[in-house]
């Protein structure tokens, strides 16, 4: 079984408007409310693949109850740690080809709750094949929290796929316990390296060979429409993807994480892991809904992806 962790989940609310008018009333005909957060996007895709997955993280209040009820409707297994504060809302306004987002920061998590979740989390680890940790940390949680979670996974010899950014990622990179996989994009890589990282193969190879990534088995860098660049052990790969009609790119990174997680659990080869991850990322981009893939198109895209050692 695979475990996904979303420390700062949300109720994602989507409003579709022909035009967003400022300083007046905008009436919405259709509203979509779905369980949100990067880890839950990963969960949905793994579930669609037919993988055995359990969703976890922090939930609180009536919105937390709503989120669990929505997961139940989708037959997604979950085991969340309950906190006293309310789970957040995140609003996306789709208007005239644009997307304006209003994101609540999320609940405050007490020191007692932070400690409690680590104990709760450790009890979930036996018999797990892979843990995927995604997204931001809520207020109140120590900035090295992901490092603590990774250390616990290491004690139980469970591989970890980590998809986060900013200070939380830097803490992990500078810490003793390393994840199995990280998935930065070039912007995030530039922040880590404190210099501009382009899509150039030589530049990427030099960056990923930096000592800051020592101990991390896989580094998979998203290059958007240009595919991906990866380092596994001491081997580098360039992944070339076909051109597709993009409908909604939001969540494509999470779908890629789902592919990585699924392939790791299956013991897939390097080529199969990279092709599966990128196929699912593209499939997500072809759909209106975030964290959804049309598997009827899977084989067609999979066969068009090229993985070359460089």
Curated annotation (Swiss-Prot):
Catalytic activity: D-tagatofuranose 6-phosphate + ATP = D-tagatofuranose 1,6-bisphosphate + ADP + H(+)
GO BP, sorted A to Z: D-tagatose 6-phosphate catabolic process; lactose catabolic process via tagatose-6-phosphate
Family annotation (InterPro entries): Carboh/pur_kinase_PfkB_CS, LacC, PfkB_dom, Ribokinase-like, Tagatose/fructose_Pkinase
Pathway: Carbohydrate metabolism; D-tagatose 6-phosphate degradation; D-glyceraldehyde 3-phosphate and glycerone phosphate from D-tagatose 6-phosphate: step 1/2
Top-level enzyme category: transferase
Keyword line: ATP-binding, Kinase, Lactose metabolism, Nucleotide-binding, Transferase
Any Gene Ontology CC annotation: cytosol
One term of GO molecular function: tagatose-6-phosphate kinase activity
Pfam families per record: PfkB
Superkingdom as given in the UniProt entry: Bacteria
Entry EC number(s): 2.7.1.144
PANTHER family attached to this UniProt entry: 1-PHOSPHOFRUCTOKINASE, 1-PHOSPHOFRUCTOKINASE-RELATED
Similarity comment text for this entry: Belongs to the carbohydrate kinase PfkB family. LacC subfamily.
Protein name, entry field: Tagatose-6-phosphate kinase
Organism, as annotated: Streptococcus mutans serotype c (strain ATCC 700610 / UA159)
Encoding gene per record: lacC
């Amino acid at each position: 079984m695979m475990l996904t962790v979303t420390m700062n989940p949300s109720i994602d609310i989507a409003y579709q408007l022909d035009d967003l008018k400022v300083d007046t009333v905008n009436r919405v005909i259709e509203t979509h409310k779905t369980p949100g957060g990067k880890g839950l996007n990963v969960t949905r895709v793994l579930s669609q693949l037919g993988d055995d997955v359990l969703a976890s993280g922090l939930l609180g209040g009536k919105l937390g109850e709503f989120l669990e009820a929505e997961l139940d409707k989708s037959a997604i297994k979950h085991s969340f740690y309950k906190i006293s504060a309310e789970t957040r809302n995140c609003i996306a306004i789709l208007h005239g080809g644009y997307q304006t987002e209003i994101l609540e920061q999320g609940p405050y998590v007490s020191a007692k709750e932070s400690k409690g979740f680590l104990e709760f989390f450790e009890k979930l680890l036996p018999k797990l094949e892979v843990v995927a940790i995604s997204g931001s940390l809520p207020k109140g949680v120590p900035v090295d929290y992901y490092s603590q979670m990774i250390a616990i996974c290491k004690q139980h010899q469970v591989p970890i796929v980590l998809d986060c950014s900013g200070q939380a990622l830097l803490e992990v990179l500078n810490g003793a316990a390393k994840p199995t996989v990280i998935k930065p994009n070039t912007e995030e890589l530039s922040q880590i390296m404190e210099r501009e990282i382009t899509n150039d193969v030589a530049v990427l190879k030099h960056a990923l060979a930096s000592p800051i990534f020592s101990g991390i088995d896989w580094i998979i860098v998203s290059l958007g429409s240009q595919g991906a660049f990866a380092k596994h052990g001491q081997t580098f790969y360039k992944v070339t993807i076909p051109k597709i009609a993009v409908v909604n790119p939001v969540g494509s990174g999470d779908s890629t994480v789902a592919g990585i997680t699924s392939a790791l659990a299956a013991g897939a080869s390097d080529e199969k892991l990279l092709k599966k991850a990128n196929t699912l990322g593209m499939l997500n981009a072809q759909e209106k809904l975030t964290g959804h893939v049309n598997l009827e198109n899977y084989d067609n895209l999979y066969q068009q992806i090229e993985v070359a050692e460089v």
